[in-house]
Amino acid sequence: METITLNEARRVIDAAEEKAREIDCPMDIAVVDAGGNLKAHVRMDGAFIGSINISINKAYTAIAFQTETKELAPLAQPGEELFGLNDAAGGDLVIFAGGIPLKRNGDIEGAIGVSTGTVDQDQEVAEAGAEAFQTVGN
């Protein structure tokens, strides 16, 4: 199984930080490896302390379910097939936008999780990091 390297994780975080600065919203940004283990994390000056674990858990959730966290919210509503998911695993699963698997050549090698802004801002910053992963090594 291929997994993200520390150097690649740093480049992902750098790209996400750049987008966060561009939209003027300091963020907590986490990258996990293919096994869901924390590879790198940064809390930008001004980012919420409460968002540290949320960013890490978004990345973990994205790798654990191999999908963007924003895709899980509709499925976790009352009456839906994944209702209660956000309470599973000790509350470590996050079902709103900002977590994205990092894919290369169709394989998931890690994930990014971003938190502090609105869910749209978190998603935008996570997308910038995920896009940067596509160019690592190219």
Language-model segments: which ranges?
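Flexible, solvent-exposed loop/hinge segments and secondary-structure transition points
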Residues: 1-138
